[in-house]
Amino acid sequence: MREAARVLRSGGLIFAAIITRYAPVRYAAKHEPALILKEREGLEQILGSGVSLARPGVGFTNAYFAHPSDLTPLMEQNGFEMLDLIACEGVVSMIDDQLNGLAGDLWQAWVELNYRLGKDPAVHGAAEHLLYVGRKKG
């Protein structure tokens, strides 16, 4: 964030996405339910600290999974003001296959509802990714 703040001019826009602390739980539930037992220690480390260290054969890099409440203060500390914070998956994540088959007004109604609810802070903890839209102060 410091580098973004350094190179962005005053009033410039920043779009920053994070993977949330709970994304690995959602991934495990959907794709590999046995991970809750096989990788319990790693999962608990992520839930507690957000830190995940790469392990041979696992296929994911070192990562920090942020708690949703950490993003706005981090951005403010680096000179940005929040314009929007959106849960990228929204409330229809994991059930989107059925909705993707819709068309016309019915599709649009679901898109609009999902987008609106994605801005609700209560939904942010259930999202896998958050999109921060901000402006550099000054």
Predicted regions and their residues:
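Conserved class I S-adenosyl-L-methionine
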Residues: 13-46
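C-terminal lobe and adjacent flexible extensions of AdoMet/dcAdoMet transferase-like proteins
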Residues: 74-138
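Acceptor-substrate binding/catalytic loop of class I
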Residues: 55-70
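Phosphate/oxyanion-binding loops and surfaces in catalytic or ligand/nucleic-acid-binding neighborhoods
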Residues: 7, 21, 78-81
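Accessory recognition modules or surfaces
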Residues: 39-54, 93-104
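Generic alpha-helical structural signal
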Residues: 2, 69-72, 111
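A short glycine-rich, Lys/Arg-flanked "PGG" loop and its adjoining helix->strand segment in the class I
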Residues: 1-13
